[in-house]
Amino acid sequence: MEVQKIKPEPACYHAVNPEKLRTARFLERPNRFLVRCSLEGQDIEAFLPNPGRLWEILLPGTELLISKDGVREGRKTAYTVIAAKKKNTFILLHTHLTNDAAEFLLKVGKVPGLEGWRVAKREAVFGRSRFDFLLEKDGRRLILEVKSCSLFGERLAMFPDAPSDRGRKHVEELAGLAEEGVSGAVLFLVQ
């Protein structure tokens, strides 16, 4: 099966510049990808790159970490939500940054069971799906799908926090590829 590289959309994938980070207070969530929050006493809207329900995190008054990205073509808001604070800890909500965190953990050998594997490609296409990583080790290949787990209790993490056709499709596709002899895994990043 051929691996293809898909170009990421520039409006979605970018590193977080610490100088652009601000704290705001969550007010409401009009839709899956938009929040209203209070920034320095002014109500603003921010893009939320996370379609999960997040009911236990996005409560009125919750502290948000947002990035001022500016309005440009293809964007409706000047801000993007990066994380939300819960019990003195920020929970990463920017799902596109989850893969950056996973790649870092892979590179420094901090993912149990995946020590020594290197990232050969990001956004690799196999079958009908695009997967987060193609890893290589000693001539072997492994498809890795990364999922951010933001629904949790004291000692319990749950995924997904909402029905996910895309998530189900990825798991089914990984199972089908495994039947063809292609190795695959799912990495859950629990925060």
Question: Model regions: which residues?
Answer:
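Structural detector for short beta-strands of small beta-barrel domains
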Residues: 18-28
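Conserved catalytic cores of phosphodiester-cleaving nucleases, focusing on short active-site segments
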Residues: 24, 131-161, 174
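Short, charged beta-turn/beta-strand-edge "cap" motif at the junction between a beta-strand
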Residues: 28, 68-74
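Short aromatic-glycine-enriched beta-strand elements
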Residues: 31-36
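Short alpha-helix capping/helix-loop boundary micro-motifs
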Residues: 44-54
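Short nucleic-acid-contacting surface segments enriched for D/E, G, S/T with interspersed K/R
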Residues: 52-65
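OB-fold/S1-family single-stranded nucleic acid-binding modules
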Residues: 73-88
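A short acidic/basic microdomain associated with nuclease active sites
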Residues: 110-126
